[in-house]
Swiss-Prot record:
It comes from Homo sapiens (Human). Residues 225-543 are annotated as: Interaction with SNX1. The modification N6-succinyllysine is found at residue 551. Changing residue 268 to Q: Strongly reduced ubiquitin-binding. Reduced degradation of ubiquitinated EGFR. One of its GO terms (biological process) is protein targeting to lysosome. This is Hepatocyte growth factor-regulated tyrosine kinase substrate. Gene3D superfamilies: 1.20.5.1940, 1.25.40.90, Zinc/RING finger domain, C3HC4 (zinc finger).
Length: 777
């Protein structure tokens, strides 16, 4: 940071204050001096200025850019290295994109353009030139460039040189001889050769620092030269014809000496008159410019044309080489006449009001009252510009405008310049100023113009205050507009948040409604599921009830006593894969299939089934007395059709399917009644050869007559099968479709030949044969 960091920060805050109305050059120059003399490091200073440049307030940013411009122009290479790099250029480009203030944007463009022109011959600062070219390609409009803006006075203190001996006396450095550096030339010296201290203005070092003796002498010689140069003639005198005259005093003869004596006498007289006039002037000054009044009265001064219009006095000593312009100032009679007229004219003690005073708009400033004071009579009075309006050209009481003001200032400047030149000329020639009437007359003329000059200064101060007030009002308006813009932005933000909140509430309500509808849907689905479960339970209950009823029916059948069943109506049918009964009922009831669990044969059905029915079929009815005891054993487990003869157990069904195997219950005592009866012989039906496979056989439906049975003769109808019985007839022509088991080999089913083609291998059965019974159970 450096030793002067606190001072630097204070000066930087002062130079970039937002309360400034114009640039504070004094603080900026002090900042430059701190950096140049090394009290503040260049890197720290540039970083601090960058922070001010990035400030939100555009006034602070603009003043910070002014500080950066001055630092770059006055502080040399150390600052150039910190500013003319890629990081700083990128920061300025970003600031240009973000900044909306026109003045700040123009200042950034102006600085980049000036730096690009100043560093165009420096290869290490080429990034500035590249940035300038890129911004031109991007379309940025740079302000008008003046080459004088890129003139940098970059003188800085030289770098210190390191060595082992003194640069002047060549003494080796050691423990007792320390190294010292001269701040002016940068060389290394011993303590004796660098014992002087001096300021170095060209490097901005205003405090006394250690320098070597040659540099000290050089700096002091320059200081003495500057002190003597203050007495040199100004450029106005050097360009005038008076400067071309010979400055050596001419050779004096007797005539010249006499003229000199007369001149001295005239000067003495003029001095006495001047003293008297000085007393009168002081009195008039006290009355015309009271200390309590802020606006002093103005006095009219003779214009430049009136000073040169009088004829030249022939008695005045003039040489041929004297300028005629100077001769006019040496006209004593003219100035004496002017003094007499000034004494006769009264001096007003009160200000003279104007007929139409100029109104001062705004700020409550009152227009100053113009007072005409004529210490020297003249034909034309000089204008006194009042403070006019801000949008119109200021008018004076005599109708003259700013041009008269400029003429007055030009005449005053010429009078002062001539007065100074005359004083210097007298000094160089060794003349006494008190004896020079031209100097006295010029002094009186300038003294008469002085009050009017003060009046003009007061008016300018009032106008400055007025415009400063306008600038304050503009700043207030700008701040008010900024506050209004902020309020509008805040209002828009509030509306946007309210809209977002309303949208969020609407989304929440929609989500709640959707959740309620989902819950209702879930409840509806749950109710439907419960109803479906309830229906399934009811169906299951009904099925269980039916199963219970069937079980009860089966139990009732098992518990009912057996009744004798006449077998005369039964027709023996062969079992082909199952047992099928073809009852011979009434014509209105065709033969049906009775599965397991059927209710046929129950007492309820026995009422109808017990009615006699005509026998249907080609075979006669079987007498009930021809029962054979061995027929009881021919009971097939599945309900199906029976044949005329009972087949042996090996021929009852195919062995491929155990589900169709014949069930052979043990004969009981209940079947003895049936066995005691003699069965009726049936016609012999040839039995076809047994096939290893069972197939589906379709033919014409044949009604077979049988005696209906009931629960009482159920047990008696169950046949018993014996090994001595003939084999069961497997097929009868004209029977309903039968189901036979398919062969495992997948071959086509073998169809039984019709009855007409079957050989009559068997004759009618014997008297002792038993008829085969069919079970519907």
């Amino acid at each position: 940071m450096g030793r002067g960091s606190g001072t630097f920060e204070r000066l930087l805050d002062k130079a970039t204050s937002q309360l400034l109305l114009e640039t504070d050059w004094e603080s900026i120059l002090q900042i430059c001096d701190l950096i140049r003399q090394g009290d503040t490091q260049a890197k720290y200073a540039v970083n601090s200025i960058k922070k001010k440049v990035n400030d939100k307030n555009p006034h602070v940013a603009l003043y910070a850019l002014e500080v950066m411009e001055s630092v770059v122009k006055n502080c040399g290479q150390t600052v150039h290295d910190e500013v003319a790099n890629k990081q700083t250029m990128e920061e300025l480009k970003d600031l240009l994109k973000r900044q909306v203030e026109v003045n700040v944007r123009n200042k950034i463009l102006y600085l980049i353009q000036a730096w690009a022109h100043a560093f165009r011959n420096e290869p290490k600062y080429k990034v500035v030139q590249d940035t300038y070219q890129i911004m031109k390609v991007e379309g940025h409009v740079f302000p008008e460039f003046k080459e004088s803006d890129a003139m940098f006075a970059a003188e800085r203190a030289p770098d210190w040189v390191d060595a082992e001996e003194c640069h002047r006396c060549r003494v080796q450095f050691g423990v007792m001889t320390r190294k010292h550096h001269c701040r002016a030339c940068g060389q290394i010296f011993c303590g004796k050769c660098s014992s002087k201290y001096s300021t170095i203005p060209k490097f901005g070092i205003e405090k006394e620092v250690r320098v070597c003796e040659p540099c000290y002498e050089q700096l002091n010689r320059k200081a003495e030269g500057k002190a003597t140069s203050t007495t040199e003639l100004p450029p106005e005198y050097l360009t005038s014809p008076l400067s071309q005259q010979s400055q050596l005093p001419p050779k004096r003869d007797e005539t010249a000496l006499q003229e000199e004596e007369e001149l001295q006498l005239a000067l003495a007289l003029s001095q006495s008159e001047a003293e008297e006039k000085e007393r009168l002037r002081q009195k008039s000054t006290y009355t015309s410019y009271p200390k309590a009044e802020p606006m002093p009265s103005a006095s009219s001064a003779p214009p430049a044309s009136s000073l040169y219009s009088s004829p030249v006095n022939s008695s005045a000593p003039l040489a041929e080489d004297i300028d005629p312009e100077l001769a006019r100032y040496l006209n004593r009679n003219y100035w004496e006449k002017k003094q007499e007229e000034a004494r006769k004219s009264p001096t007003p003690s009160a200000p003279v009001p104007l007929t139409e005073p100029a109104a001062q708009p705004g700020e409550g400033h009152a227009a100053p009252t113009n007072v005409v004071e004529n210490p020297l009579p003249e034909t034309d009075s000089q204008p006194i510009p009042p403070s006019g309006g801000p949008f119109s050209e200021p008018q004076f009481h005599n109708g003259e405008s700013e041009e008269s003001h400029e003429q007055f200032l030009k005449a005053l400047q010429n009078a002062v310049t001539t007065f100074v030149n005359r004083m210097k000329s007298n000094h160089m020639r060794g003349r006494s100023i008190t004896n020079d009437s031209a100097v006295l007359s010029l002094f009186q003329s300038i003294n008469g113009m002085h009050p009017q000059l003060l009046e003009l200064l007061n008016q300018l101060d009032e106008r400055r205050l007025y415009y400063e007030g306008l600038q304050d009002k503009l700043a207030q308006i700008r701040d008010a507009r900024g506050a209004l813009s902020a309020l509008r932005e805040e209002h828009r933000e509030k509306l946007r948040r309210a809209a977002e909140e309303a949208e969020r509430q609407r989304q929440i309500q929609l989500a709640q409604k959707l959740e309620i509808m989902r819950q209702k849907k879930q409840e509806y689905l749950e109710v439907q599921r419960q109803l479906a479960i309830q229906r399934l339970q009811e169906q299951e209950k009904e099925r269980q009830m039916r199963l219970e009823q069937q079980k009860q029916t089966v139990q009732m059948r098992a518990q009912m006593p057996a009744f004798p069943l006449p077998y005369a109506q039964l027709q023996a049918m062969p079992a082909a894969g199952g047992v099928l009964y073809q009852p011979s009922g009434p014509a209105s009831f065709p033969s049906t299939f009775s599965p397991a669990g059927s209710v046929e044969g129950s007492p309820m059905h026995g009422v109808y089934m017990s009615q006699p029915a005509p026998a249907a079929g080609p075979y006669p009815s079987m007498p009930s007395t021809a029962a054979d005891p061995s027929m009881v054993s021919a009971y097939m487990y599945p309900a199906g059709a029976t044949g005329a003869q009972a087949a042996p157990q090996a021929q009852a069904g195919p062995t491929a399917s155990p589900a169709y195997s014949s069930y052979q219950p043990t004969p009981t005592a209940g079947y003895q009644n049936v066995a005691s009866q003699a069965p009726q012989s049936l016609p012999a039906i040839s039995q076809p050869p047994q096939s290893s496979t069972m197939g589906y056989m379709g033919s014409q439906s044949v009604s077979m007559g049988y005696q209906p049975y009931n629960m009482q003769n159920l047990m008696t109808t169950l046949p018993s099968q014996d090994a001595s019985l003939p084999p069961q007839q497997p097929y009868i022509a004209g029977q309903q479709p039968m189901y036979q088991q398919m062969a495992p080999s997948g071959g086509p089913p073998q169809q039984q030949p019709p009855v007409a083609q079957q050989p009559q291998a068997q004759g009618p059965p014997a008297q002792g044969s038993e008829a085969q019974l069919i079970s519907f159970d």
